[in-house]
UniProtKB/Swiss-Prot annotation:
Chain spans, region Disordered: 22-43
Keywords: Ribonucleoprotein, Ribosomal protein, RNA-binding, rRNA-binding
Ranges of residues in domain S4 RNA-binding: 92-170
GO MF annotations, alphabetized: rRNA binding; structural constituent of ribosome
Gene Ontology cellular component list: small ribosomal subunit
Assembly description: Part of the 30S ribosomal subunit. Contacts protein S5. The interaction surface between S4 and S5 is involved in control of translational fidelity.
UniProt-recorded name of the protein: Small ribosomal subunit protein uS4
Length: 200
């Protein structure tokens, strides 16, 4: 399945989450798109709930179905709880760390920064969004990209940086200090539903 590249507000309203991170797309119309959106009261099956949770998380991180499932399978080979390991692997993606540092307003924009070669890891250019960032690695904006307008605009509006990352706005450099705790990850996601979905 290809990555969705259409309007993110449609997916946000359909799934009931804000993919932009601002919540604006849900303020005026907090229901699925379409003329019958506000009156829909369809009962959802257990399978439907599990699938919806999977779709929420997949779209939140902007992955294709194959990328999503591959990451899920990789998490299953690690010690510990499958769902928790899965969420941590998603958080360790380079595009997500770039987003968490405030260098991009959305994960989609962060993925473009990485794809276009604007980001380095430990001084080396990395253009793979799925690259897994390890604790202690240094993420920087390339010197040639320091005046990128998209990065500058994002830094102007971004104020919250999670405690598990640090960022120096002067040098445009940050790092992953530690793995995020459950309370610091997406509270609106129930990863147990996703584990159940793939266990069927």
């Amino acid at each position: 399945m290809a990555r969705y590249t259409g309007p993110s507000w449609k997916v946000s309203r359909r799934l009931g989450i804000s993919l932009s991170g601002t919540g604006k797309e849900l303020e005026r119309r907090p229901y699925a798109p379409g003329q019958h959106g506000p009156t829909q009261r369809k009962k959802i099956s257990e399978y439907g709930l599990q699938q919806a949770e999977k779709q929420k998380l997949r779209h939140m991180y902007g992955l294709t179905e194959r990328q999503f499932k591959n990451t899920f399978n990789k998490a299953g080979k690690l010690q510990g709880k499958h769902g928790e390991n899965f969420m941590i692997l998603l958080e360790q993606r380079l595009d997500n760390i770039v987003y968490r540092l405030g260098l991009a307003r959305t994960r989609r924009a962060a993925r473009q920064l990485v794809n276009h070669g604007h980001i380095t890891v430990d001084g080396k250019r990395v253009d793979i969004p799925s690259y897994q960032v390890s604790v202690g690695q240094v993420i920087s904006v390339r010197e040639k990209s320091a005046k990128n307008s998209a990065i500058a605009e994002s830094l102007e509006v971004s104020s919250f940086v999670p405690e598990y990352v640090t960022f120096d706005a002067e040098t445009l450099t940050g790092s992953l200090n530690r793995l995020p705790e459950r309370s610091e990850r997406a509270a609106e996601i129930n990863e147990a539903f996703i584990v159940e979905f793939y266990s069927r």
